[in-house]
Amino acid sequence: MTSRALYSTRSQLCRHLAHKYLSRSYSTRPSLNEVVIVSAVRTPIGSFKGSLSTLPATKLGSIAIKGAIDKAGIPVEEVKEVYMGNVLQAGEGQAPTRQALLGAGLPLSTPATTINKVCASGMKSIMLASQSLMCGHQDVMVAGGMESMSQVPYIMAREAPPYGGVKMEDLIVKDGLTDVYNKFHMGNCAENTAKNSSISREEQDAFAIKSYTLSKAAWESGILAKEVVPVSIPQRGKPDVVVKEDEEYRKVDFSKVPKLKAVFLKENGTVTAANASTLNDGAAALVLMTADAAQRLNVTPLAKIVAFADAAVAPIDFPIAPAFAVPKVLKAAGIKKEDIAMWEINEAFSVVVLANIKMLDIDPDRVNINGGAVSLGHPIGMSGARIVGHMVHNLKSGQYGLAGICNGGGGASSIVIQKF
């Protein structure tokens, strides 16, 4: 071979290797997996010290996780990891989600992580699981949330007082319902939002009555029953009591709603026990997987994860944080608010939903169409997962649903799904 021919051959080889190795680094980008929801269930929601109060959050979580896997129709061994939201963890024991998944019969080899983003914990669990599935770290996961507010303990300081009595603190209030920056109850933040947004007591009461009315109608029509798995409560020497229905929505007397005193502001206060959410017990869980895993397991997906986003504002303004998360998730999804057929904005307080409807300029008739936390209850680690699961069951084919939930500290999470 002549030197010229050898040079030509070497040049061709160099160009081939450059194309093979160098161009690959610059011309290709990894694609994310499509994530689908194949089941979504929840327990009934129990009233504070009510029907579910004897069961710890971890047991409620077990029931929801098992129910979701059973509905999906897949072997428990297929679940590679579990994320569950849980806020008030004191006294539950180590690794609450680990307890919940083992109680649901999952293998000892299944990893678990507990998520605490206050009221957004259940939704954030879904978001984090979706990220893991999108990136290919796992292919089948369970995500949701659980809370037993009835079993939250009181605490006292470890130091012995030099003189006088011992002060006990309620961890529901301290860890769940107090703005740590302003040193007051979340209800005071709601009052601040009502004032700044010019939302009256009458508007909040009307919204609460509507929430109770819608929840009652949804139960009577069977809409809510399809997302609920029964809970059996063991009894001493008697048959188990089976709880199949939410407890809170029946506990209302509409004639008393306008007569109740404001709870947080004595003068010109607007937030009452009726137009705020209640303390509750319950759990929700969803089975998520990649589209490839759904095909492999011969599972029919119900909906797909389109996009999700978080936002943060001043802690006192937490009630309006969803109004900042929603534009971000719409942009990420590449759609407009007019494309959303169903909105779920968590009813921590009636004023939360009213303020966000006003700020986002959305149709109130598409928001919380079957009631919400004011009437159904708000187990704080569960609610974010509950509202996502509710959309899964109630959207029609091809429709988009958007759920948003505020959280203490001045935050919110939001998610868009599309029904198959």
From Swiss-Prot:
UniProt: K(+) binding residues: 212, 273-274, 276, 374
- Give the source's domain of life in one word: Eukaryota
Role, per record: This is one of the enzymes that catalyzes the last step of the mitochondrial beta-oxidation pathway, an aerobic process breaking down fatty acids into acetyl-CoA. Using free coenzyme A/CoA, catalyzes the thiolytic cleavage of medium- to long-chain 3-oxoacyl-CoAs into acetyl-CoA and a fatty acyl-CoA shortened by two carbon atoms. The activity of the enzyme is reversible and it can also catalyze the condensation of two acetyl-CoA molecules into acetoacetyl-CoA. Thereby, it plays a major role in ketone body metabolism.
| Residues forming the catalytic site | 119 (acyl-thioester intermediate), 406 (proton donor/acceptor)
- Protein name, entry field: Acetyl-CoA acetyltransferase, mitochondrial
Q: Which pathway or pathways does this protein act in?
A: Lipid metabolism; fatty acid beta-oxidation
Q: Which gene encodes it?
A: acat1
Q: How does it assemble?
A: Homotetramer.
Record-listed E.C. numbers:
2.3.1.9
| Gene Ontology cellular-component annotations | mitochondrion
Q: Which reaction does it catalyse?
A: 2 acetyl-CoA = acetoacetyl-CoA + CoA; propanoyl-CoA + acetyl-CoA = 2-methyl-3-oxobutanoyl-CoA + CoA
Q: Which family does it belong to?
A: Belongs to the thiolase-like superfamily. Thiolase family.
Main enzyme class: transferase
Gene3D superfamilies for this protein: 3.40.47.10
**Residues under site feature: Increases nucleophilicity of active site Cys:** 378
Q: Which InterPro entries does its entry note? A: Thiolase (IPR002155), Thiolase-like (IPR016039), Thiolase_acyl_enz_int_AS (IPR020615), Thiolase_AS (IPR020610), Thiolase_C (IPR020617), Thiolase_CS (IPR020613), Thiolase_N (IPR020616)
What is the species of this protein?
Answer: Danio rerio (Zebrafish)
